[in-house]
Amino acid sequence: MKKIVVLSDTHGNLGAIYSIYDILLESDMVFHLGDHFDDMNELSQTLGDKLYRVYGNCDFGRDPKEILVEVEGLKIFATHGDLYGVKRSADRLIERAKTLGANVVFYGHTHSAEIREVDGITIINPGNAERYGTNKSFSYCVVSGEKITAVINKNID
């Protein structure tokens, strides 16, 4: 069983990240989906190789923009989402996931938290944790075998 924390769109709000510090340390994997990718720099040494990051549209020309990670038989496709026009529709994102053979998609960019399933693919957007945003949130996931269970947690400052 793997415990995964997914964050996105922190936009410089280090307080939000540190408000879940213990949860980050206790997790097996931490994904930051961009828009202020560098917000995780201070924790990168502490989290080590359990930290996975992709760059967002506010991270200006950096790579990687997407990654594919296998966890207990599940393929997780992680991206910020801007490359796929997710503010209009998730269709292109879902097609990319299918092309990659992904079972799970983590994405951000919209600042709107959601968990849903489309064509057998679990789609998770943790929402945003930006300083001036409303409804700050992150996602907490548990992978057991080839099954993922996810919740949106709004207990973030």
Predicted features, each with a name:
Residues 49-50, 115-130:
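Short acidic, glycine/proline-enriched helix-loop-strand junctions
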Residues 50-88, 100:
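Helix-adjacent hinge/juxtasegments
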Residues 11-15, 37-41, 58-63, 84-88, ...:
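Active-site environment of divalent metal-dependent phosphoester hydrolases
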Residues 89-95:
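An amphipathic, basic-hydrophobic alpha-helix
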Residues 18, 71-72, 95-101, 124-157:
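Binuclear metal-dependent phosphoesterase catalytic core
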Residues 6-8, 29-35, 52-56, 78-80, ...:
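Active-site neighborhood of phospho(di)ester-bond hydrolases with catalytic His/Asp-centered motifs
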Residues 1-5, 68-77, 117-123, 143-150:
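Beta-strand-turn-beta hairpins that frame and shape the catalytic cleft
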Residues 1-49, 59-65, 136-137, 141-147, ...:
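N-terminal active-site segment of His-dependent metallophosphoesterases
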